[in-house]
Amino acid sequence: MLETLITKYRALGIDKQIDYDKFYLYSLVTHSTAIEGSTITELENQILFDHGISLKGKNLDEQHMNLDLKQAYEKAIEYAKQHKPITTEMLISLAALVMKNTGKEYQTMLGDFSSARGELRLLNVTAGVGGRSYMNYSKVPMKLAELCDMLNERRAKSATMSVDELYQLTFDAHYHLVTIHPWADGNGRMARLLMNMLQIEFGLIPAKILKEDKEEYIKALVTTREEDNLDIFRTFMSAVMQKNLQNEIENYISSVGDVPEVHDEGVEYQKSKPKKIKSKDKIVALLKDNNKLSAVALAERIGISAKAVEKHLSNLKADGIIKRIGPDKGGHWEVVEFTGMANTIPIVKIME
């Protein structure tokens, strides 16, 4: 179901609209801060981000929360494009951006630390009044390092993973980070940021958690933790993703009107006929973004058979557009020359 909706979303060209990447980023920021109590809307953030105009009736902390998270996302997107290894130091640097103007200094028996600098907590915290305590602060550095190692190991295998498996990996990253709770504040924003950073790296549509889903979102996290069952959070996130995609598709169709009919076998245009992106162009675009993708992974992303992909790869190689570096197993592709429509392939890249 999720993969079908993504195919329809991209076939309709929703992510090819002017300034789509910018506005999707603004939406991610707005909804993430709304979960934490911000009342700033997407339109208000557009004014704040694009024009630097202070918002009447909104306190400075709210505005700083949104401005800081936007800056953190921009840095995370850079890391995603560069396929940087995920490390404790990287997460601390991102947390410092998230909490730059709203963090504070803490004084403890073990020493002082600052959430504004992204420093790991030196005190224990609970999930609200009467809630269960998160892991002891002394275990945080080790558990955070283990999480980074696990994510890097699974990222290395991403080229062979299905879309559903990739989303599950990003949902798991979110859950594990918020469960470790490395910081005194900003853990929720950081967990959603890490999830979205991975989704952007994998060429997925980043997941949004809307304010109206906050209660169910928190329940899913708590229940997953209590029952030690990741499938609970995975199922919740998949359902939220499906609902949001369906709503965006319906809103797009109702506002545009003249849109293509999307079928399992492809896209059929009724009135206007935009130039259809060829499979070979999609393959080249995907290889430019990730040169280690296998034929199976390419087939799944494009929606054709692996055998068809292999034929396209052979033709592209013969035409001198791509070449193979190293052996079939362990090697990678290099894009030599391309003048087709690769830049129009529907891969979510939030920042240009």
Go through each PLM region and give its residues.
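FIC/Doc superfamily catalytic core
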Residues: M1-D185, R189-E352
